[in-house]
A protein has these predicted regions:
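Catalytic cores of carbohydrate-active enzymes
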Residues: 8-9, 118, 122-246, 288, ...
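Active-site-adjacent structural elements in folded domains
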Residues: 14-19, 95-117, 179-189, 201, ...
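Short, well-ordered loop/turn elements at secondary-structure boundaries
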Residues: 26-29, 43-44, 113, 188, ...
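Aromatic-rich carbohydrate-recognition surfaces in CAZymes
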Residues: 1-89, 116-120, 124, 257-283, ...
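Active-site acid/base region of carbohydrate-active enzymes
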Residues: 1-6, 30-31, 37-115, 140, ...
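Long alpha-helical scaffolds in large eukaryotic adaptor/regulatory proteins
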Residues: 43, 130, 134-138, 281, ...
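Short acidic (Asp/Glu) and glycine-rich catalytic loops that position anionic groups and cofactors
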Residues: 178-180, 194-198, 246-250, 265-266, ...
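Non-catalytic C-terminal accessory modules of carbohydrate-active enzymes
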Residues: 221-224, 251-259, 269-454
Length: 454
């Protein structure tokens, strides 16, 4: 929007452009910045920042006649992020919610005084990447962004990790006295653990190895079910559809999608987190739970479902919310069946394929490097993959748990480098120039990967 730089929660295009929301959840402002940051990291195409673009008019929801450069749009966007931290902190205000639509706040006080731990972690990840990729183009923007993400890091650990467990939310009371929500100490919601902040804190490298280990144990004990990793350890309280804290989570009569807690978008992000920290025993097996093909071989308490469609959720077979409230643990013991939820919904299939290729098989390319960083279980030793990278057809063979990390392209050893994330070495990297010199556009190129234990 032209007045403050915020984005609508949802919007339509072209002749329907006047149809859009006039507010948004607290995380929405972050995603456009993440898109630009990811693009610059991949391409270093800084010319895009000089492209002139209109805004959306707050008055009539149409495009403005006035245009500004993308960098000016980003300037406005970052100002909005700064202006909407909880007072005296670098914690993003919850606003009208976050990714989980069912947890929209039920009253104005919660909207203004809550922060989502997941949104805070996403903001840290995005602003940090933007600071890094913008450095050689605009050092002032880089320094400004650095101050923000360092502040986010400090306040996340000061307020949200004041206890050993990351809360789902933080409510900032008078005198900046934090109250942890969806946390073992939370007596109001009756919910102890929330998945999204834990996995995003790993993906963003916001927490250290000791904290990662602690939260993996929590996920294993409280959030991992036979069919999927769940958003919370139990559903929000249901009392006839009356909202006390959250809207749809406490209103919905149907225990499906996010209300039923096994929302597959979040399960995929769990796979991404396990790849980031190097848990090969978790990556492949949890991807298998998503595919409906032969689902009963992987999830034995699954009911029959269509085999050629992506399902956005795995819903417990409860007839009422009260039944689910009393017997939710039967999903863990497999006494209760699970069924496929909404089909072919939103970006799920794309996120699924991206995690398979980019983070589990580990094939990633940026402006000058090809990285192969598999996080695969040892039973897939010898796996071969036919893959096309630009105009090069490749047969990639994965030799796992080797004593030496090396790569051969068409039988010849390649000089490699290795990058360390906060938790582990990330496979092997090859200069793209070398890759193109050693491969051909005709026929199949053999790429043999020899990789040590993750």
């Amino acid at each position: 929007f032209d007045d403050d730089g915020n984005w609508p929660q949802w919007f339509m295009f072209d002749k329907f452009e006047e149809i859009k929301a006039d507010e948004s959840h607290g995380d929405i402002i972050v995603w456009p910045l993440k898109v630009v940051s990811d693009y610059l990291a991949m391409t270093k195409d800084y010319s895009i920042l000089e492209e002139e673009l209109p805004y959306s008019s707050r008055e009539n929801f149409k495009q403005t006649a006035t245009k500004e450069t993308l960098l000016q749009h980003i300037d406005k966007q970052i100002s909005y992020i700064e202006d909407n931290f909880l007072e005296g902190t670098y914690l993003s205000c919850y606003g009208d919610g976050d990714w989980d639509d069912t947890l929209q706040p039920a009253n104005q006080s919660l909207k203004k005084n809550m922060a989502s731990s997941w949104t805070v972690a996403l903001t840290y990840q995005t602003v940090k990447l933007f600071s890094e990729v913008i450095t050689e183009y605009n050092e002032d923007f880089s320094n400004r962004s650095k101050k923000i993400y360092e502040g986010v890091y400090h306040d996340f650990h000061k307020y949200m990790l004041s206890d050993e467990v990351i809360p789902g939310f933080l409510f900032m009371g008078e005198g900046n006295k934090p109250e942890l929500m969806i946390h073992p100490k939370d007596k109001k919601t009756g919910i102890d653990y929330r998945l999204l902040p834990m996995t995003r804190s790993m993906i963003s490298e916001l927490i250290d190895q000791e904290e990662v280990t602690k939260h993996v144990e929590i996920i294993d004990e409280h959030l991992k079910f036979p069919d999927a990793v769940r958003l919370m350890n139990c559903p929000a309280n249901y009392a006839g559809g009356v909202s006390q804290i959250f809207k749809r989570a406490e209103q919905a009569a149907n225990l499906g999608r996010e209300v039923g807690l096994a929302y597959i978008h979040a399960h995929i992000r769990y796979v991404e987190a396990m790849a980031k920290i190097g848990k090969p025993e978790e990556t492949w097996s949890n991807l298998e739970k998503i595919s409906p093909i032969g689902i009963k071989q992987v999830v034995s308490n699954s009911s029959l479902r269509q085999a050629n469609a992506y399902f956005s959720s795995s819903d417990g077979d409860f007839k009422t919310r009260y039944d689910a409230q009393d017997n939710f643990n039967e999903l863990k013991t497999k006494e209760r069946q699970v069924k496929g939820g909404w089909r072919i919904y939103s970006s799920g299939p794309g996120i699924y394929i991206n995690q398979l290729i980019s983070n589990v098989l580990g094939i990633r390319k940026n402006v000058d490097q090809l990285t192969i960083d598999p996080v695969l279980p040892i039973e897939l030793d010898g796996l071969s993959l036919t893959y096309k990278l630009n105009d090069r057809l490749l047969k990639i063979t994965y030799n796992l748990n080797q004593s030496v990390d090396e790569v051969k392209i068409n039988g010849k050893l390649v000089v490699i480098s290795q990058k360390q994330n906060r938790y582990r070495l990330e496979g092997v990297s090859i200069p793209l120039e070398t890759f193109y010199e050693m491969t051909t556009t005709e026929g199949i190129n053999d790429v043999e990967l020899f990789i040590g234990e993750v």
